[in-house]
Amino acid sequence: MQSEQVFDSIKARLLNDDNLADQYRALFTLKAIGQKGDRRAIEAIYEAIQKSSSALLKHELAYVLGQINDSYALPHLNTILADESQDVMVRHEAAESLGAISNLDSLDILKKYSADQSLDVSIRETCDISIKKIEFDHRPGKDTDNDNEENQIPVIDPAPATKSSDSNAKDVKNLRDIYLNDGLPLFERYRAMFGLRNIVLNSTSSQDIHTEALNAIADGFTDKSALFRHEVAYVFGQIDSPAAIPCLLKVLYDENEHEMVRHEAAETLGGLGADSKTAKDALIDFANNQSAPKVIRDSCIVALDMLAYEQSGQFQYADGIEKA
């Protein structure tokens, strides 16, 4: 457990609205602290949600509460989801985090907001996905049915990846068919999306299979659901492939695209920009463009800080303890 002095220093950085990029670094330091069971991190993150004026930061704060995966955060997430003054992105992330923690007690509030037709569709869709994830996680016989595969990256996905057998062309086609079928529940399509992601990340996949799966994921940018499209951009960040840069730039520059999707594309480009001067230049342009939506400008500021970290050789992005 961190000393009170060190912890207070990290918390102060998180609450300092003068430097958004530094707030992100402090947040991910607190995430690591919270994942070790120190609940002071949860309280500090919730305090930041109450005090921050940045929808981008607040949505990331809500996301981290879910990734810490401690039921202690549930009352805070319930409050955020119910708060009509919060941005849609923030409430959506609170709903997703309830699914990440996956407590059966969360089903009632998720069902309430899933059925509320007055809410933005992204919130309702997220609630529905989280309901299905919790029910899936608590299904009878889950320990023996072998219905999902172990995650290849250290995150809690909104839906568990569909397991593929051999990472071959048939697997890619089957997953793609589910992934792009807008007549299916988003939960099942998300599962297919993460299954395709895992095929790309699988080191034993051939280059042809890798490319097929990557192209299949990119096809998701044509979907009618902004929530779905934003998850596509997020998954490209997990894949960390320079091949995704052209389609992400197209999304970022599309003024008709939902801000939720454009901001996710910007942050993903921050992780890929070291491989592309075009990507870096685009992020710089948007970060300095006062006519661009604030959430996109802020995303580009954070993305450029991530890019600077990638190019600096620093040991870790979450540097709060080092700076405390």
What do the PLM-derived regions correspond to, one by one?
Residues D18-N19, S53-S54, E84-D87, Q117-S122, ...:
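Short inter-helical turns and helix N-cap capping residues of alpha-solenoid HEAT/ARM repeat scaffolds
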Residues M1-Q2, A21-K36, E47, L56-D70, ...:
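Structural detector for internal amphipathic alpha-helices that build alpha-solenoid repeat scaffolds
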